[in-house]
Amino acid sequence: MPGFAPVNTGGPELEYAFYEAERRVLGIQAKLHCWARDDAHRRFDDLFNLVCDPAFLLVAWVRVRSNKGARSAGVDGYSAYAIEARGVEGFLDRLRSQVKDRSFRPLPVRERMIPKAGGKKRRLGISTVTDRVVQASLKLVLEPIFEADFLPCSYGFRPGRRAHDAVAEVRHFASRPRCYEWVVEGDIKACFDEISHSALMDRVRARVGDKRVLALVKAFLKAGILGEDRVLRENNTGTPQGSILSPLLSNVALSVLDEYIAQAPGGPSSSEWQRRVRRRQGFPNFRLVRYADLCRGRHKSAYAELWIMPTGLLDGPPGGRGVVLGAA
């Protein structure tokens, strides 16, 4: 994973400590990723100490502080700048103690409604800075493990991958000698709002055996939402949009879809012989390109839309649509 660009971490001493911490974190992340990659069934039982490790918390703080959302405060009213003014080292020491003795409790997420095209609105959750730092530390620990499991078709919110890479992959499938002729596009229904907590936690447990880390992840999922009307709502499904952990957890949940499609007849896991037989029989072969909750499949037959839509995982029109490549 790439290092950070130089940032203002709060003084020369803290800046030096950050670079030392970053080196330690990157080394541990590399080990976690290798262990997960080399053993697809390995469960990690001692991750909690990494989450509250001073190096991980410091790197997590720098990520939160350098993010454009550092100006935004959660329900406690404190922005990252306000915390920085009161002293970063003391803040991180107190936070580490709270996480380590398990007295830390996430606060409700402050909800804001962001306008979307067509007059609709999208929910955005703003966590407290304290919660963001713990989430960022959790992500530093969990991401290299789950990255070992994610398939190449997934591009959204992954290190070293971006939207342009997904577009390039789609173009690659459309070019010779592949010449896929159809694109079926669809959005995952209410992806961030409707993900089942129990199903998601089952997926996380497949890799994480540390009950303290599992409890921490679940606590963030259940933290509740404080709406713009100041009414506190329970959060029984989904991951709050805007949360640092949400993109990773959404990819963990949606990796089930990636694996299902990869193993389906005519999918990426099919042999060349199987794909040739399907072509002779008039059945489609296909590839999947997923960017977060947006899916695009390249197909060689109009039957593709009839196959993929009834799975219930994709919205129909206007969320899903078929396009003939080269058509006006």
Where are the regions that the model predicts?
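N-terminal core-binding DNA-recognition domain of tyrosine site-specific recombinases/integrases
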Residues: 122-125, 181
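Nucleotide/phosphate-binding loop and acidic/charged catalytic motifs
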Residues: 138
